[in-house]
Design a protein with these regions (language model features):
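Bacterial N-terminal signal peptides
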Residues: 9-17
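Bacterial N-terminal signal peptides that target proteins for export
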Residues: 1-9
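Exposed acidic/polar residues on beta-strands and adjacent loops within beta-sheet cores, strongest
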Residues: 22-158
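Compositionally biased, intrinsically disordered low-complexity segments
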Residues: 5, 17-20, 91
Length: 158
């Protein structure tokens, strides 16, 4: 009987401990906790190679103005080499989407590798649209950092 009560007491104590304190500490916990709350998502997307270095493209979506708008970035992150940690070697911003006077609020961001380049599809709402329609943008980012941004279904200007 005493053994049964001891087991129940042990289980009750275990259940009272918050799950977060039971999780094992990780190497990256401090860095992850240091991420700004405005970073909405980070997507790995394809591989790049330049001279003797290689790595992964990283797409970063962030909220601005308390979530009223969104911004998009692509970063080149190196693969770690023999004790040399990963580094961000380049960051590209998209002025067509990241304008705080004409903000877009992203509904979804998807990315896929296309050979050495990447293509990002952004579905967003524009703050000045009266009909609150969903716009779609395709962004092709080349290995050197140049890009082409097109709005799907947009009228061509003369």
């Amino acid at each position: 009987m005493v053994k049964r009560h001891a087991t129940l007491l042990a289980l009750a104590c275990f259940a009272a401990v918050p799950a977060s304190t039971l999780a094992a500490e990780s190497w990256m916990r401090a860095q992850v906790e240091a991420l700004p709350a405005s970073v909405r998502q980070v997507l790995p997307c394809g591989q790049w190679t330049q001279a003797s270095r290689q790595g992964t493209y990283r797409v970063v979506e962030a909220n601005v103005n308390e979530g009223a708008g969104s911004e998009l970035y692509v970063q080149w992150v190196t693969d770690p080499l023999q004790g040399d940690p990963s580094r961000i070697t380049k960051t590209v911003a998209f002025s067509e989407l990241n304008d705080d006077h004409s903000q877009y609020r992203f509904e979804s961001v998807q990315c896929r590798a296309r050979g050495a380049a990447i293509e990002i599809t952004v579905k967003a709402r524009y703050e000045h649209d009266e009909d609150d329609r969903l716009r779609t943008f395709n962004v092709r980012v080349e290995p050197g950092g140049s890009y082409r941004l097109d709005e799907v279904g947009a009228r061509k200007r003369k």
